[in-house]
Amino acid sequence: MSVIINYDKLLKRIRHKYAIPIAAARRAEGLKDFGRPKLDPQMVKQAGDKINIALKELEEGRIVIRNEEMLKILVPKVK
């Protein structure tokens, strides 16, 4: 069974849609290298791979982006 990721919840937590995959990828790398999931073991077992674990952690607010000022470069300039 896989974990369902609610993209609307992710967008409420992280305002910039382009930051979601970047943050999830960096967290998944951290989990692969040295990190421990911040989810309960049953959820980790259901999620399976590192990217799903990272997305679920973001959705639940268990990890946050420290420097949101950096994310301003992701916002397109519309004329």
Swiss-Prot record:
Instruction: Give its E.C. classification number.
Output: 2.7.7.6
Query: EC top class, in one word?
Result: transferase
Report disulfide bridges, numbered on this chain.
Answer: none
Question: Which controlled-vocabulary keywords does the entry list?
Answer: DNA-directed RNA polymerase, Nucleotidyltransferase, Transcription, Transferase
Instruction: Tell me which GO cellular component terms the UniProt record holds.
Output: DNA-directed RNA polymerase complex
Q: Name one GO molecular function term.
A: DNA-directed RNA polymerase activity
Question: InterPro entries this protein is in?
Answer: DNA-dir_RNA_pol_omega, Pol_omega/Rpo6/RPB6, RPB6/omega-like_sf
Q: Can you tell me which family this protein belongs to? A: Belongs to the RNA polymerase subunit omega family.
Please identify the protein, giving its name as recorded: DNA-directed RNA polymerase subunit omega
Report the source organism: Kosmotoga olearia (strain ATCC BAA-1733 / DSM 21960 / TBF 19.5.1)
List the top taxonomic levels of the source: Bacteria, Thermotogati, Thermotogota, Thermotogae, Kosmotogales
- Gene name of this polypeptide: rpoZ
